[in-house]
């Protein structure tokens, strides 16, 4: 069992399961929110640079 920081008690199975569930939810949130936002910003930057440097 994992030692909790600053505490004498060790992590129980229930606490471990909850921690793993929270980590999984955090990872899913990154995949569904952060990556698409980063891609959108990157695409907007490419479009801006292309339009600023093109010779219309």
Curated annotation (Swiss-Prot):
Pfam families tied to this protein: DUF4519 (PF15012)
Membrane topology: Single-pass membrane protein
An annotated GO cellular component: membrane
Region (Disordered): 1-27
InterPro entries per the UniProt record, alphabetical: DUF4519 (IPR027960)
Coiled-coil residue spans: 9-31
Transmembrane regions listed in the UniProt entry: 30-50
Chief location of this protein within or outside the cell: membrane
Cellular localization per UniProt: Membrane
Entry keyword set: Coiled coil, Membrane, Transmembrane, Transmembrane helix
Family: Belongs to the SMCO4 family.
Protein name: Single-pass membrane and coiled-coil domain-containing protein 4 homolog
Organism expressing this protein natively: Nematostella vectensis (Starlet sea anemone)
